[in-house]
Design a protein with these regions (language model features):
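Conserved catalytic or regulatory cores that recognize and/or transform ribose-phosphate-containing ligands
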Residues: 1-100
Length: 100
């Protein structure tokens, strides 16, 4: 079976078009390396009881990470709190960390 990877990217202050543009480039790199890319671009609104949207989406990303062997970190990841946590999790749980 194909190895799976997800993309960790800064999103703050970016619109959907910019986010998806960065994702497409990262996806091409990963597919070229033989990975299947797990989608972690979430657009659904959280349930009304969610009081911290960024934390909700981070939790969803971490759940998706459990399906992956690797995580690709886009440029600027080290200044984005969600990406920093994803990098710590990927490292702690033995996933391959790929830096742009």
């Amino acid at each position: 079976t194909e190895m799976k990877a997800m993309i960790s990217q800064p999103m703050k202050g970016m619109n959907a078009e910019e986010i998806l543009g960065v994702r497409e480039k990262a996806k091409a790199v990963l597919e070229n390396e033989g990975y299947e890319v797990v989608d972690t671009y979430f657009t659904d609104e959280p349930e009304p009881d969610v009081v911290n949207r960024p934390l909700h989406f981070l939790a969803m990303s971490l759940a998706k990470m459990s399906e992956c062997e690797a995580v690709y970190f886009c440029r600027g990841w080290d200044a984005a709190r969600g990406c920093i946590i994803e990098q710590a999790a990927a490292t702690a749980y033995g996933l391959d960390v790929i830096l742009e």
